Amino acid sequence: MLRMSLIVTAGLLAAAAGAVTRTPLIPASAKPASPPCPDVGLRLPAGFCATVFADNLGHPRHLVVAPNGVVYVNTWNYGGGGPVQKGGVLVALEDTTRDHRANVIERFGPTPGQGGRGGTGIALYKGALYVEERDRIERYALSEASIVPKGPPEVIVSGLPLSGDHPMHPFAIDADGVLYVDVASATNACQAHNRRARAPGITPCTELETRGGIWRYDANSTGQKFSPAERYATGIRNADGIAVAANGHGIYATQHGRDQLHDNWPALYGPEEEATQPAEELLHVRQGGDYGWPTCYFDEIQGRLVLAPEYGGDGGKALGPCADKLAPIASFPAHWAPNDVTIYTGQSFPPRYQGGAFIAFHGSWDRAPYPQGGYNVVFQPLGSGDATERSQCEVFADGFAGAVKDPGRAAHRPSGVAVAPDGALFVSDDSHGTIFRIGYRGGTEAAAGSFTPCPPVDAPAGATGTASEKPPEGVHANAGTAANLPVPPGSTRAAVALGDDVFHGRVGMAGCSGCHGSDAHGSPQGPNLLAPTLLWSDGSPEGLARTIREGVLLPRQFTLPMPAMGGAQLTPEQVSAVAAYLWALRQGAPGR
């Protein structure tokens, strides 16, 4: 592990993102000339350059950059998602050589062996580091002698709900010390049976008493307990990104729209609507505001909140109580998964970016059989008040996924964004543990008039027509080779081929590959189906069919459950076919 002696000052930043301030190791006047921009696989506007700041960090989620340039990252040890890094779940990184790559990397905090799970949320305030760890928000004092804290953390808030589909707790701290924390929903749409076909919504949705909103606490006080009384805003399904406004007061949040409209309600929604509805959202969060979940979802094509099918909706026409809910200030293509947002307050990017929002889109799983989307960083200008211009929405950084946009096979999945004191943008990836640094090298006007607009939402990007066609980007490991797979006893080659189609969403719209990966090797949404030992089945065709048919209604040896038939409505023939296909895939898997 590299260690450096650092010269420090005693000054503290007075703004909300304050932290220990240390003088740079190299004076600004001595800054070396920029080296040639390396090719790291990203597509950026003219004049921008991306470098790999660090890699192999595990599963980095959100990150912050201190005034001295030290990058702090929270990682998530969610289990079953690849190798667990040694050391603590928190990471401090520093570039003392000014080559835009961290040469000092230190881990701290609890290790996975000590029960450390990490999380998503992280922030700086008054010279201290605030982090999410399991059901708590903790505070570490930062000293002048080291980039990592030496003492134990203090507990700011404890008892945050951990169960269900969305256990993370992103948060932000404003200039007044108000800590805003997301307590996301435990379910997809507050159904009586989560993610099951035609399951009605619970009325009233009791989940909203303790979930589905943003809560408010005091960042200066320790020993606070989670309480329904501290709710700040409601009707927010999953605000994975929260950012303080440029003036230090008030917050913006991203909202993950609900899933499985066609899977659960095929009489009301077709496959195309599954891929294009509902929108992902950017909210300007107001105290006491109700943003509609679970009763409503935002139909981006119509530009309004409409009544959800679980609560009497008719496929997008009825409004009901949604007419009185608060709409987003900007919206984005369905299922892109906005995992973080930051407001650009740096000075090095062209003027177009000042005061706007950079949003990290983790990437979709719920658009099969059409191409998955997201896996990028989008810039959304913010005008005065809540005004935004959709036409100015920009796909700022793309190419993270590499050759295949698939949750289990993407090269990188953006999970966090943060602005550095020098104006650079840092992007974290929780798939392969990479931190990217994006800086601007051109003149201030070079990129002002040229950008890649966000795609339209009235049709799935890249859709080629019928659901029987292979998705253009979804060429999975066995595409076109089902005929060469072995056939289970008592089954047929036609059944294996049908199972291939059902698994990849071309028939039946189950979209199993969305959770388990297009190659069945798993993702954070679903376990590896080619492992030598399965979590939920004995691996026989009969056992596989039973698990598909009945589901796994409570989490078992994995962070998430599985609804019966993936939440779709499969025929007995289709269930048996998927089981036959998985059995056939497993015969050639390593360890067998």
Where are these regions (language model features)?
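C-terminal capping alpha-helices of c-type cytochrome domains
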Residues: G423-L425, D430-T434, Y440-T444, E542, ...
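Beta-propeller domain segments
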Residues: T21-R43, M168, S185-S227, I236-N238, ...
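Periplasmic/extracellular electron-transfer cofactor-ligation site
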Residues: L42, S146-V148, G223-F226, G250, ...
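Electrostatic cytochrome c docking/interface patches
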Residues: A467-V507, R592
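Gly/Gly-Pro-rich "capping" loops immediately C-terminal to redox-active cysteine motifs
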Residues: R107, S513-E550, P561-Q569
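Conserved beta-propeller blade signature
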Residues: V70-N74, A128-V131, V178-D182, G250-T254, ...
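Residue-level detector of Asp-centered blade-edge/turn motifs that repeat once per structural unit
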Residues: A66-N68, L124-K126, I173-D176, A243-G248, ...
